[in-house]
Swiss-Prot record:
PTM summary: Carboxylation allows a single lysine to coordinate two nickel ions.
Taxonomic source organism: Arthrobacter sp. (strain FB24)
GO molecular function term, any single one: urease activity
Positions of substrate binding: 222
Protein name as catalogued: Urease subunit alpha
Length: 576
């Protein structure tokens, strides 16, 4: 016998379904559910008098050896580059093993996830599930960045550094074997995935190659160490040999050549460009044009995202501190001024919206904010909708109804998840909500989406969660704050997080030599990449910058936007 529910009643009980829309935080962005893999009337829900009980939604006869999941997230709305849909998500041995319909096949048809006595339940009803964020521009200045990143929904940190040394405060570099191996050991107790960049500055190849064999997953070329054409070429030669990435912060002062010289030195080889607009550093005033090349994987850092009335004013002091400049030296001030251009910053939001810039990252404590990658990405998406309207798929693909924001949502979620993972050769393990991936997942209340997660899972175990007073009689009394959970303690840290290394370092026995206990994965497939491999952000137009006015054009059309006066996902959510 069937029973009819209104959409509101159904959403209250089991979460929204196909055709329903969800507003993301206090933005003007609306997610529309494209499909529902659960079965109407057979939804699994946990609780007193609910479905997931022995002989009902739970099969009491199967053992864990019969591929029963360790955890099922029920009735969650998944927001991912792969789609926007509702499903049950099964996790086993720290990986996503199935996305579909959970329950007990003895009493329900269409079940492809069997809930057993070994299965924990996380209620995903009325929640949004995303992949953990991947931040590819980390200055490892302070260990306190790790919980800050995790509590924002970022589960992977890629970059370089040794602590608050001058080299680290300016450049994402962990220089040399000794520092690389000490940092690998230091991060063993941190419940986050880690990858380190070596220093990409040497006039010979071997000083670079030895860093890759020591455990670096790539090389960083930075102007503060001298972003010369020889450094670029040698780093890329080593990268080609060992299948690792080269990240670059180019030459603001144009001392060693102009952007055209850097492009020639790169020579068509794949490279990951940081803060490609230029305020964070790079050929003045036209580094932004490199984003149109098919071999360049271009990123923004979050200080310039989105463009607001305060963006220009705050940058000068940040830059002076981060790059060890002296405000009493006119040349240092001129250097800083040359990097801060309202015209190129105004173009950056639009280039993100057009899918030309493909990645967002933080530049943590070195002009960027490690806990704001996700928030600022969605602030840009909201600002662009308000200024440019609904974004349509230029390929004509179907992404929900005519006025849905689904295409824009897929483009923007890809920027800090799958595209960042692809750029660093990590996408086989992380970066999306797909079967076979490491279960780094973030569960959001829609009202707090992109601002404050409800749960952060690392390798299938809860690492951080919104939690109330531990002395209270229930979990929810105020103050509710993001607090470390059991995956952040003891030996669980090693089983729930990944240390990424080069294959050469693994072959050389670095994990055994250093006694590394985290899950070890090799980066791979990097040197064959092109921008076409990036999801929803693969545009390669002709970008030009007027050297006098700094006006930016894309295929001959002016590209700019107005600064925002007010942003969503801001003071409404934060006291400080």
């Amino acid at each position: 016998m069937s029973f009819e529910l209104t959409r509101r009643q159904y959403a209250d009980l089991y979460g929204p379904t196909t055709g329903d829309s969800i507003r993301l935080a206090d933005t003007e962005l609306f997610l529309e559910i494209e499909k529902d893999l659960t079965v109407y009337g057979e939804e699994v829900v946990f609780g007193g008098g609910k479905v997931i009980r022995d002989g009902m939604g739970q099969n009491g006869q199967v053992t864990r050896d019969e591929d029963v999941p360790d955890t099922v997230i029920t009735n969650a709305v998944i927001l991912d580059y792969t789609g926007i849909y509702k499903a049950d998500v099964a996790i086993r041995d720290g990986h996503i093993i199935k996305i579909g319909k959970a329950g007990n096949p003895q009493i329900t048809d269409g079940v492809d996830i069997v809930i057993g006595a070994s299965t924990e339940i996380i209620a995903g009803e009325r929640k949004i599930l995303t992949a953990g964020g991947v931040d590819t521009h980390i200055h490892f200045i302070s260990p306190d960045q790790v919980p800050t990143a995790l509590t924002s929904g970022v589960t992977t940190m890629v970059g370089g550094g040794t602590g608050p040394a001058e080299g680290t405060k300016a450049t994402t570099v962990t220089p040399g074997k000794w520092h690389i191996q000490r940092m690998l050991q230091a991060t063993e107790g941190m419940p986050i995935n880690i990858g380190l960049f070596g220093k990409g500055h040497a006039s010979a190849v071997e000083p670079l190659a030895e860093q890759i064999r020591a455990g670096a997953i790539g090389l960083k070329v930075h102007e503060d160490w001298g972003s010369t054409t020889s450094s670029i070429d040698n780093s890329l030669k080593v990268a080609d040999e060992y299948d690792v990435q080269v990240a670059i912060h180019t030459d603001t002062l144009n001392e060693c050549g102009f952007v055209e010289d850097t492009i020639r030195a790169i020579g068509g080889r794949v490279i990951h460009t940081f803060h490609t607009e230029g305020a964070g550093g790079g050929h003045a005033p036209d580094i932004i044009k490199i984003a149109g090349l098919p071999n360049v994987l271009p990123a923004s850092t979050n200080p310039t995202l989105p463009y607001t009335r305060n963006t220009i004013e705050e940058h000068l002091d940040m830059l002076m501190v981060c790059h060890h400049l002296n405000p009493d030296i006119p040349e240092d001030v001129a250097f800083a001024d040359s990097r801060i251009r309202a015209e190129t910053i105004a173009a950056e939001d639009v280039l993100q919206d057009l899918g030309i810039f493909a990645i967002t990252s933080s530049d943590s404590q070195a002009m960027g904010r490690v806990g704001e990658v996700i928030t600022r990405t969605w602030q840009v998406a909201d600002k662009m909708k308000k200024q440019r309207g609904v974004l349509k798929d230029p390929a004509g693909g179907a992404h929900g109804s005519e006025d849905s924001d689904n295409f824009r949502l897929k483009r923007y979620v890809a920027k800090y998840t799958i595209n960042a993972a692809i750029a660093q050769g990590m996408a086989d393990s992380i970066g999306s909500v797909e079967e076979g991936k490491f279960a780094d997942l973030v569960l959001w209340d829609p009202a707090f989406f992109g601002v404050k997660p409800e749960l952060v899972l690392k390798g299938g175990q809860i690492a951080y969660a919104l939690m109330g007073d531990a002395n209270a009689s229930i979990p929810t009394p105020q103050p509710r704050t993001m607090r470390p959970m059991f995956a952040a303690f003891g030996k669980a840290v090693q089983q729930s997080s990944i240390t990424f290394l080069s294959q050469a370092a693994i072959d050389a026995g670095v994990p055994e030599e250093l006694g590394l206990q985290k899950v070890i994965r090799a980066v791979s497939g990097i040197r064959s990449l092109s921008k076409a491999d990036l999801k929803y952000n693969d545009a390669t137009p002709d970008i030009q910058v007027d050297p006098e006015t700094y006006k930016v054009t894309v295929d001959g059309e002016d590209v700019t936007c107005e600064p925002a006066d007010v942003l969503p996902m801001a003071q409404r959510y934060f006291l400080f």
